[in-house]
Regions:
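Active-site histidine-anchored catalytic micro-motif
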Residues: 1-136
Length: 136
């Protein structure tokens, strides 16, 4: 059996945000065994799984990605939406637009320190739409 839910997250500031609880609030009862596919419908934000216990991880992600892919690169052509836009597309392509999480005993089978992240790469990204597909 397959269920699908489309929902919007509230607007987040630029950075990395743990959204595990927000995602779970959108889902009905999970099957005993299955998989959750989570897809973001945007090209300047991403979803990933990473450590959710230490807030320094969030800050370090932002610092590293901004060091590797800075704004205001003089050779970028796609700049009409702002200097943060093209770097946001590149960062989103690197991290990706979807994740898969196993469902075991009716719960997401995440590791002890793992959480679902929204990676917001725009200064003013706005509400982000996600599609959650639960396959049992």
């Amino acid at each position: 059996m397959t269920s699908q839910y489309e929902f919007s997250l509230p607007s987040f500031s630029r950075g990395y945000h743990v959204i595990t609880d927000l995602v779970m609030k959108q889902l009905d009862d999970l099957p005993d065994v299955g998989i959750l596919n989570l897809f973001i419908k945007h090209t300047s934000a991403a979803v990933t799984i990473n450590e959710s216990a230490d807030p320094d991880v969030l800050a370090d992600f932002e610092s590293i990605f901004n060091h590797i892919i800075p704004e205001n690169l003089p050779f970028l052509k796609h700049t009409m939406e702002g200097t943060d836009d093209m770097p946001a597309h590149i960062k989103a392509a690197i991290i990706g637009c979807s994740i898969q999480i196993p469902i075991t005993n009716g719960r997401l089978n995440l590791g002890t320190w793992q959480g679902i992240y929204l990676c917001e790469f725009r200064n003013l990204g706005g509400a982000r739409k996600l599609v959650a597909t639960v396959i049992s």
